[in-house]
Every structure is written in structure tokens, then in C-alpha cells.
Amino acid sequence: MDKTLLESTVHKVLDELRNRPIPLGVSNRHIHLCAADYARLFPEQAIREKKALLQPGQYAAEQTITLAGPKSQLKKVRLLGPLRNVSQVEISRTDARTLGIAAPLRMSGDLQGTPGIRLISPFAELELASGVIVAQRHIHMSPLDALIFRVAHGDTVSVAIEGSERRLIFDNVAIRVSPDMRLEMHIDTDEANAAGADDPHTFASLVARR
């Protein structure tokens, strides 16, 4: 194969990879707990896996928690595993209004200055001092994915939600790159409803880097 043909073939393959559908994950309200908070809420109980998630090693647990805010409660909020270093609650804007909490838009782990909430399990209650956020929409990528899409960790991009009757373009989609991540875009339930993402044929596609 001559050099020109080889380069043409490589560019064609890369273009196909860049234009391939990005799996779309809809994140319902959920909670991450540190070991100490988990032990208080579920004493002498091992965390039990209910369903594996697409991201390697992550799963929805059998355990659920009630979130108690100033205005209302949300019951049966799913715990995600494994346990983390810091407890964190991720909700939608609609959930925040229901609870009466001014949860800021943040990336996971960016918890400084965030409000707290009361956590209630079947065994105990715990006042979480901070950690309630509305998660910024984002795309998980491996380093190879990032190389193919020509983006880097911390970049923001515009993404089209395709495949439903309510095609929508989201700006300010954060890129998160790690060797243990698989390609997947995460949006919350408010964003999913706006884009008609309950359609099983829905997927994400990169529109532009911002």
C-alpha cells in the first residue's frame, strides 16, 4: 500500500471513529457515601451490588436513602458504589426545588460551598453538612477516546442529542478523561426529558469544541 493510500485510509478510519454515536446515560438522583457515613447509616451491613453501571467498577447498590430537605423529602434515592472519600448527593434542578435546596451546578467532587441535607436510612439519620450538587453534564472518555476526538480533560464541547423527536444541542458539556473510563455522556433527568432521551434509539454526537 502506498503512503498516500495509507494516509487516506487512516484519516477515513479516524473520521468514522470521531463521528460514531456516543452512548447516553441518564443519571437519576443518587448518592455517594464515604465509609464513615455509610457505617453510620447502614451499621454492620456490607454494600450490596444491584446493577453494574457502564463505567468500570461502578454500580447501583441495593441500599437506598431518603433525602430530607427544608420543603420536602425524596424517598428511595439509590446509593452508588463503591464507597468514596467524600459523601456527595447529585440531584436535578427539579429535585432541588422539591427539596427546597439551592444546589449549585458543579462537577462531581467540587463540593466547596455546597449545601447539606439530612440523610435517612432504615437504621439511622445523618446530617450531611455539605455535598449536594446538580451535576454538570459531561462525557467520560479514555485517553484514546480523547485523542481520537481531539479533546482534553477539562475541555467543554457542544453535543447534539440525536435519535428522538426532540433533537437538542447542549453547550458546556465537560470532558472527563481517565484510563478507567468508557465513552459515555451523562445528563440528568431534566436534561433527558428536554431532549426526549427516554427513546432507546437516542445517542449523543460531538458538534463542536468550545
Swiss-Prot record:
This is Phosphate propanoyltransferase. There are 2 Zn(2+) ions per monomer; Zn(2+) and CoA bind inbetween the 2 domains in each monomer. It catalyses: propanoyl-CoA + phosphate = propanoyl phosphate + CoA. It comes from the Bacteria. Belongs to the PduL family. Keywords: Acyltransferase, Bacterial microcompartment, Metal-binding, Transferase, Zinc. Its main location: other. GO terms for biological process: propanediol catabolic process. NCBIfam families: PRK15070.1 (NF011652). Its cofactor is Zn(2+). Its EC number is 2.3.1.222. Zn(2+) 1 binds at residues 30, 32, 90. CoA binds at residues 26-28, 71, 78, 193.
